[in-house]
Amino acid sequence: DREYRVESAKMLATVLHGMKGTPYIYQGEELGMTNVPFSSPDDFTDVESRNVCAERRAAGYAEADILASLQAKARDNARTPMQWNATAQAGFTTGTPWYPVNPNYTAINAEQALADENSIFYYYQALIALRKTQPILTQGSFEPLLPDDPDIYAYLRRWNGKTWLVVCN
């Protein structure tokens, strides 16, 4: 979400870290890194992306539809360089990375996140600490609520006489 990137990232983290099981954090997720705005299907370098592109071109798909599909689903988005700071190549390398650095690296990077006490990074730290100190999150039962509501993801966590309600929209 371009307008509510920080709020959306925190909400999705809340959903994930409040659920049962082991939450996994992928590189850059804790910073709210976004997908690179590739402008052409040819910008994608992953083998699977290139195969999908070739198959869809052969099937007569429009370039715009191929691009939209790759932007939403391609693995390339998770393989861009980690955005450490606002220096050249986002502080990832002094050379040329295989994947391009996201152009938003000057605004979204680890150095910036560490300087902002309300950043997504610190929110993740708080969620991880909560999971370590609140057994309801690691041992409690899970009960989904409002399963048919397209705008609200809600559930209960119960354990040892306690109940937590998690509501995200």
Question: Where do the protein language model's features map onto the residues?
Answer:
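Active-site and adjacent substrate-binding regions of carbohydrate-active enzymes
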Residues: D1-N169
